[in-house]
Regions:
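Structured, contiguous alpha/beta core segments that scaffold functional sites
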Residues: 1-197
């Protein structure tokens, strides 16, 4: 077998810049959540599409998808012992809703549930909410819209109050956001620092 020989590079001339290559990488900015005049809700990022962007990342990359799905499956484990009890009219069980909530936490850093109160102040039904359809209100509560892209959906957003066990009427949104220092209105996923890679 022949020996492989390496040749040492010639001494670099500090005035010769012809061999310098500059690489610039796109920066994935951390979204800014701010109030906008004339709107009753807090925008979710500069263009109000940050949840859709996170969904795009999840669906676009096989590795990213596999890591997040695996993490969610690991957290869910075997589910609840009695988790096959229906929680709503559509037949979603506690385990079904829990799986969706866990995946939302892994992708977005939080989840939303619609709580439907019945007579006597008891919770009648629980539904998982598509995370991308809700925006936090400036005062309290949430705003629902099937799509926040005004080119697709011209409907006005619908106000839904935040969960309040002291006011058990109608439908309310229960919100869970993971804690992250410096965030006020919306959570950030734990992988936010790796979005540039």
């Amino acid at each position: 077998m022949d020996d492989i020989k390496f040749q040492a590079p010639a001494a670099l001339d500090k005035d010769d810049t012809s061999n310098i290559i500059v690489l610039k990488f796109a920066d994935s900015k951390i979204p800014v959540f701010r109030e906008t005049r004339g709107r009753d809700y807090i925008k979710y990022g500069d263009d109000n599409f940050y949840p859709e962007y996170l969904t795009y990342l999840y669906n676009k990359s096989g590795k990213h998808n596999a890591i997040l799905t695996g993490k969610a499956n690991y957290i869910f484990g075997g589910g609840f012992e009695n988790g096959n009890v229906a929680c709503n009219r559509t037949g979603d069980t506690l385990n079904d809703i829990s799986k969706k909530c866990i995946l939302d936490i892994v992708i977005y850093g939080g989840f939303r549930l619609e709580i439907v109160w019945g007579f006597g102040g008891k919770i009648n039904e629980v539904y998982h909410c598509d995370y991308s359809t809700l925006r936090r209100g400036k005062e309290c509560g949430f705003y629902f819209k099937e799509s926040w892209n005004d080119l697709i959906c011209k409907d006005k957003e619908e106000y839904i109050p935040a969960f309040d066990h002291l006011c058990p009427f109608g439908s309310q949104i229960f919100s869970y956001d993971e804690y992250r220092p410096g965030t006020r209105y919306y959570p950030l996923p734990d992988y936010i620092g790796s979005n540039n890679y």
